[in-house]
Regions:
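C-terminal polymerase-core module
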Residues: 637-670
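The two-metal-ion catalytic cores of nucleic-acid processing enzymes
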Residues: 1-341, 347-457, 461, 470-489, ...
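Gly-rich Lys/Arg/Thr-decorated short loops/hinges at beta-loop-alpha junctions or inter-strand turns
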Residues: 248-262, 587-606
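Short beta-strand
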Residues: 87, 625-629, 661
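Active-site-proximal segment of RNA-dependent polymerases
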Residues: 470-472, 601-609, 617
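Generic non-transmembrane alpha-helical segments
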Residues: 364, 611-622, 646-654
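Active-site palm subdomain of RNA-directed nucleic acid polymerases
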Residues: 369, 608-631
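Core alpha/beta catalytic barrel or barrel-like domain that forms the active/cofactor pocket
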Residues: 372, 585-592, 624-631
Length: 670
């Protein structure tokens, strides 16, 4: 979400205990604005920064060498500060360039932006993200504001939860595999306290519009010269409504709508009132849900309203470069959420193959769009009403099915990623993990390295990639023993790559670290070494989240003596962690990731191959036949209970990874 030029907002100095849900930069006031959702009033409160925080970036040039920048009107101050260089593992002096406007740092292709003039650090971070990181503000966490001071609020965990955490989690942390166990335990504890905070029911409304068409040509959202013929609504308070515009040549048709759906007709010259009434409804709900609302519904409504002369004071919408938002609320475009591969694969198990509302609804809900067999311009009034309201219904239900699963997931992921919920709903998992790591860098006073600095660590280093167009070798696949096999057990390495990252301290700054004494800590199957002096940031974060999911949330969600609300929370948190963890290795191994480091990616897959091969050898040693193996699982034939227990213990003792029974088959054909 980029700068918002003229948010019209109800800004307040005192806010009751509320969930921080979003943030934006207000271009007009040159300040960050925070949005808090209050579960009791079901409203969003808006608070604008009063701390005097300013945009900035860093340079490794001395302040006197940057003196020429001081002549600029938008440069406030250049001063020396100390930051920790993670690649050299030492504190260094850097120049902090403080400016009046984020555009003075970046955002243009001209010399107006300092990053185009001097080599700079941390100059590609959105200003409102910088603000959140610097103030240790976590989206999805509860805060109250008293006299313009933000005060964190943590709900106390129950005695039962604390006891469960101790028995399931902390008692198992004795052998963490981490360089600094105390730091790791603190990280786990902090995550558990944050993720166990309640997730509120969020009041929201979905919206879908229909527009006149000109033959097969789609309406142009910028010109917006075609009439809005219908707007459908569905809300969390049970409201079901549809506005329909009367036009010449349209038949009334038969009213077969559900009796709970209210139909409101507008005369053909009342399109302006129809849109104004729709805006009135939008203002009553803190969160607006659409399906492709960024690409069509909201920009069309916004531009159509301008064309019809509707006052900007009445219009609650605000258009940005590639998305749409609300001046006093939050807009979630589910098209972009369900297009996210992490959701498609890890949450919804690829139940849909394309991202249309119809395909997603059929796959996830088992429901679909109305089909009258005619184009919408040939439908009757009541067919248009039903068609449009049904789209709003499907859009809303995608957030409400399975006890508000998607909404709850989005809130939990905002907590993990430290990112506004509207950004979470639109951006891929690589952006989530980038935000989380940047937050942790800032918390620890680490200077976020430039891409070329990280690449410089491995300059001139050969690797043994064997697959065309791959920079490093991937996971291992063992050729199957062909034939029909009876009594086959599939054993799965629980979160294998996150486990490897944790146990072997893999992070961009700890693989091939600068310490001579660490070079003897060789990583099997590579020419690399791992740090033995400090926890890597990636290892610490991914490892703590992995342990929480495997040792705590997965087990806790299955306990019998917990409330339905607790079970729902633990299940959702476990799923959110699954999404992050399953995607984490792929993200770290993607060249486009800003903290990508080839040796770390290479070490992760090399260790995966090594663990699989070593486990197969251990199986042979206890006369357990392995029929097949892939990236993180083994098919074993007719195992005894003792053999299963032995191989699980060997994997844990030798490699710090957890092997578990996934499936059991009477027979398999390989």
């Amino acid at each position: 979400m980029e700068a918002v030029e003229d948010f019209k907002q109800d800004e307040v100095a005192n806010i009751p205990n509320s969930l921080l849900i979003s943030a934006a930069y207000i271009g007009k006031t040159k300040k960050v604005s925070l949005k808090f959702y209050n579960p009791e009033s079901e409203k969003i409160y808006i608070w604008e920064d009063k701390t005097g925080h300013q945009p900035y970036c860093f340079s490794k040039m001395a302040p006197e060498d940057l003196e020429f920048l001081s002549e600029r009107d938008d440069v406030i101050e250049i001063k020396t500060v100390k930051k920790i260089d993670t690649l050299k593992d030492k504190e260094i002096p850097v120049s902090k360039i403080i400016v009046t406007d984020p555009l003075a740092i970046g955002g243009t292709q001209t010399t107006q932006s300092i990053r185009n003039v001097v080599e700079s650090w941390e100059s590609d971070i959105k200003y409102y993200e910088n603000y959140l990181y610097d103030n240790s503000l976590i989206i999805g966490k509860y805060y109250k504001i008293e006299n313009d001071k933000i005060i964190p609020h943590d709900f106390e965990m129950s005695d039962e939860t604390n006891l469960a955490m101790k028995s399931m989690l902390f008692d198992k942390l004795g052998n963490t595999g981490m360089t600094d166990t105390k730091q790791f335990e603190e990280e786990v504890s902090n995550w558990a306290e944050l993720l166990n905070q309640p997730v509120p029911k969020i009041r929201r409304m979905s919206l879908d519009i229909e527009v006149e068409t000109d033959g097969m040509r789609l309406p142009d959202v910028k010109i917006a010269d075609k009439k809005v013929t219908a707007i459908g609504f569905e809300a969390s308070d049970g409201m079901k409504r549809v506005f329909v515009l009367r036009r010449d040549g349209i038949e009334e048709g038969v009213n077969d709508l559900d009796k709970n759906i209210e139909v409101v007709f507008y005369e053909k010259d009342q399109e302006k009132k129809l849109i104004e009434d729709a805006f009135g409804l939008v203002k009553k709900y803190p969160v607006l849900i659409t399906y492709n609302g960024d690409g069509f519904d909201l920009p069309y409504l916004y531009n159509r309203a301008k064309r019809l002369g509707i006052s900007e004071d009445v219009n609650p919408l605000y258009m940005m470069k590639d998305s749409a938002t609300l001046t006093k609320g939050v807009h979630l475009d589910l098209y972009r959420t369900f297009s996210n591969k992490a959701f498609q694969i890890y949450v919804f198990s690829q139940k849909y193959s394309d991202f249309s509302l119809n395909s997603v609804s059929k796959g996830v809900l088992g429901e679909q769009k109305m089909d009258y067999g005619v184009e919408i311009d040939n439908m009757t009034y009541y067919q248009i009403a039903k068609y449009c309201q049904n789209d709003a219904y499907l859009t809303f239900k995608l957030t409400s099915f399975n006890e508000d699963l998607l909404m709850n997931l989005l809130v939990v992921i905002t907590r993990i990623a430290r990112m506004p919920i509207d950004d979470i709903s639109r951006m891929g998992v690589s952006q989530w993990i980038r935000s989380l790591l940047y937050y942790e860098h800032r918390k620890n006073n680490f200077l976020i390295p430039r891409r070329n600095e990280i690449e410089g660590k491995s300059a001139g280093m050969a690797n043994d990639a064997v697959i065309k167009d791959k920079k490093y070798r991937g996971g291992l696949v063992i050729e199957p023993v062909e034939g029909v096999h009876f009594d086959v057990t599939v054993m799965d390495f629980a979160s294998l790559y996150p486990s490897i990252i944790k146990v072997n301290n893999l992070s961009y700054e700890t693989v091939r670290c600068p310490h001579e004494e660490c070079k003897k800590n060789a990583i099997p199957g590579t020419s690399h070494w791992g740090c033995t002096k400090k926890n890597g940031l990636t290892s610490l974060i991914i490892g703590s989240l992995r342990d929480l999911r495997v040792n705590y949330y997965k087990s806790l969600s299955k306990k019998e003596n917990i409330t339905d609300e607790e079970r729902q929370l633990y299940t959702v948190v476990s799923q959110a962690l699954k999404v992050i963890l399953n995607a984490s290795y792929g993200v770290m191994g993607a060249e486009i990731f800003p903290l990508y480091f080839l040796p770390a990616a290479e070490a992760t897959t090399a260790l995966g191959r090594y663990i699989i091969m070593d486990t197969i050898e251990k199986c042979k040693g206890i006369q357990l036949e392995v029929l097949y193996g892939d990236t993180d699982s083994l098919f074993v034939k007719k195992p005894t209970v003792k053999q299963i227990d032995d191989v699980i213990k060997l994997a844990k003792d030798d490699h710090g990874v957890e092997l578990e029974i996934d499936k059991e088959y009477r027979y398999v054909v390989l």
